[in-house]
Swiss-Prot record:
Binds 2 heme b groups non-covalently. Its EC number is 7.2.1.3. The keyword Repressor does not apply. Heme b 1 binds at H48, H120. Keywords: Cytoplasmic vesicle, Electron transport, Endoplasmic reticulum, Heme, Iron, Membrane, Metal-binding, Translocase, Transmembrane, Transmembrane helix, Transport. InterPro entries: CYB561D1/2, Cyt_b561/ferric_Rdtase_TM. The keyword Metal-binding applies. It catalyses: monodehydro-L-ascorbate radical(out) + L-ascorbate(in) = monodehydro-L-ascorbate radical(in) + L-ascorbate(out); Fe(3+)(out) + L-ascorbate(in) = monodehydro-L-ascorbate radical(in) + Fe(2+)(out) + H(+). The gene is CYB561D2. This is Transmembrane reductase CYB561D2. One of its GO terms (molecular function) is heme binding.
């Protein structure tokens, strides 16, 4: 028996609510897991994985879920209020990422190791730079009068698309980090696979949210 359009809509919304809640829990759980594993303060390097997971797993995920119709924790706020919270969370994520990048550079300098010698390092640098550009672009949406010649709808579309790319770059950096000697020496077996699933799950949820909010809607418009 075929489901009615209304029933399918309710099921789809319920699935998005569940997946959004899962993204909140996974983003927080992964960050706590990395913090416990790294024991921040035990060494200079120990702050790097903590700050990067805080930036690209927790803060950036929460910054994007702010706009989720089903799972936002700030649904009571106006669109403008959520946009400002989004920008603050993104800025905090950028600051954490910059600090994490700076500390690992200092750590490598102390050990006399080469910089950007791995795909993890290159992806991480690219993700941090992209996040910086994305935060700068967000200023144009907070204050659209700064860009009077650009239609606001197009600015939102470009910002959302670019933000999704930046988020996926951050997720890729985390995945590559879990292939590093430091991580694989401590985390093995099924726990490693569960850890790898964390950024994959949050990335899929964010991709679905952005695609439905901007990309798919724009594609079906005449």
């Amino acid at each position: 028996m075929a489901l009615s359009v209304e029933t399918e809509s309710h099921i789809y919304r319920a699935l998005r609510t569940v997946s959004g809640a899962a993204a909140h829990l996974v983003a927080l759980g992964f960050t706590i897991f990395v913090a416990v594993l790294a024991r921040p303060g035990s060494s200079l390097f120990s702050w790097h994985p903590v700050l990067m997971s805080l930036a690209f797993s927790f803060l950036m995920t929460e910054a994007l879920l702010v706009f989720s119709p089903e799972s936002s924790l700030l649904r009571s706020l106006s669109r403008k209020g959520r946009a400002r919270c989004h920008w603050v969370l993104q800025l905090l994520a950028l600051l954490c990422a910059l600090l994490g990048l700076g500390l690992v550079i200092l750590h490598k300098e102390q050990l006399g190791k080469a910089h950007l010698a791995t795909w993890h390092g290159r992806a991480g640098l690219l993700a941090v730079l992209w996040a910086g550009l994305q935060c700068s672009g967000g200023v144009g949406l907070l204050y659209p009068k700064l860009l009077p010649r650009w239609p606001l709808a197009k600015l939102k579309l470009y910002h959302a698309t670019s933000g999704l790319v930046g988020y996926l770059l951050g997720g890729a950096s985390l995945l590559l980090g879990m292939c590093s000697l430091w991580f694989t020496a401590t985390v093995t077996g099924g726990v490693w696979y569960l850890a790898v699933l964390c950024p994959v799950i949050t990335s899929l949820v964010i991709m679905n949210q952005v695609s439905n909010a901007y990309l798919y809607r724009k594609r079906i418009q005449p």
